[in-house]
């Protein structure tokens, strides 16, 4: 019995290996993506590359077409992308896992892997808005917390 306790104590003293995959919270996602370019492949084979501008714009292409009125924001444990004007908008939210330098984006709704990506520092692919006005209607990754007063909306705060 004493030998078993000594072995157990010795095993507990061993360093715990790091987890292979870390699930990122919204703040960690923001720190990784903001001001950087996220590029990768969807599980269906399509390629994407988007510069995550600190003002909330997602510049580049989402695999199928150049982005226009594409925006990004973080939530408690997700990154969400909004593509197109309000009248014809698509929204995609993902949880993000990090395995060394590979980011795994899972659909927030069903947890299926949507894409694998890497993050490049800055905007090395020179993604831009091509001189077009961009409309993110307050969907800004660094938007302030919701006010306690119901008189001031998030949209009005983001417009400041």
Where are these regions (language model features)?
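Bacterial N-terminal signal peptides
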Residues: 4-13
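Lipid interaction determinants
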Residues: 16-69, 81-160
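Short, conserved beta-turn/loop elements at beta-strand boundaries and strand-helix junctions
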Residues: 75-79
């Amino acid at each position: 019995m004493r030998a078993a306790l000594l072995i157990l104590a010795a095993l507990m003293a061993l360093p715990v290996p790091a987890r292979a995959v870390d699930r990122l919270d919204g703040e960690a996602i923001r720190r990784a993506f903001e001001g950087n370019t996220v590029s990768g492949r969807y599980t269906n084979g399509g390629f994407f590359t988007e510069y995550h501008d600190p003002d909330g714009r997602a510049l580049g292409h989402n695999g199928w077409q150049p982005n226009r009125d594409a925006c990004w924001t973080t939530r408690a444990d997700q990154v969400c992308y909004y593509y197109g004007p309000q009248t014809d908008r698509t929204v995609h939210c993902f949880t993000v896992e990090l395995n060394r330098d590979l980011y795994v984006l899972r659909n927030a709704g069903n947890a299926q892997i949507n894409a694998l990506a890497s993050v490049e520092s800055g905007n090395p692919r020179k993604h831009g808005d091509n001189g077009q006005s961009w409309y993110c209607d307050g969907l800004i990754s660094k938007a302030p917390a919701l006010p306690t007063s119901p008189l001031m909306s998030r949209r009005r705060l983001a417009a400041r």
